[in-house]
């Protein structure tokens, strides 16, 4: 094999390696096939989220919010959905649940979200976050426990 031929093969191999490395280390989001935030428990620092078929429940520190159903993700991984929020949830719940928007982005198994709360009792807008939660990670909520768990219904065994 000539020296020139070996050089060409080396260049081709190097180009293939660099291309494969770049493809594997890409930061582009891989979105869920159904276009919805994946089901399960999500955890982060001072934050947690539970996603079930019927609701999404988000804790940020000692406050929490709810969205009906699962959150739909757009083609870029973003979302902006309406829900409700409880600004005073621990140690006891005080006040009504108020309207909120949840805005964020899903990248791989990490979701970043900000709650924009319309505090109708104080006539002001309150922002909680942004926080990041990761699917399957433990929540680090300190003294504020997550207050809801997804309801799993099992049918009784047939006899």
PLM features: what roles do these ranges have?
Residues 70-79, 104-110:
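A short, structured loop/turn motif at beta-sheet edges
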Residues 31-65, 88-109:
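Short, solvent-exposed loop/hinge segments that bridge or flank secondary-structure elements
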Residues 31-49, 81, 113, 140-158:
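Tryptophan-anchored aromatic micro-motifs
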Residues 78-88, 116-118:
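Generic short beta-strand segments
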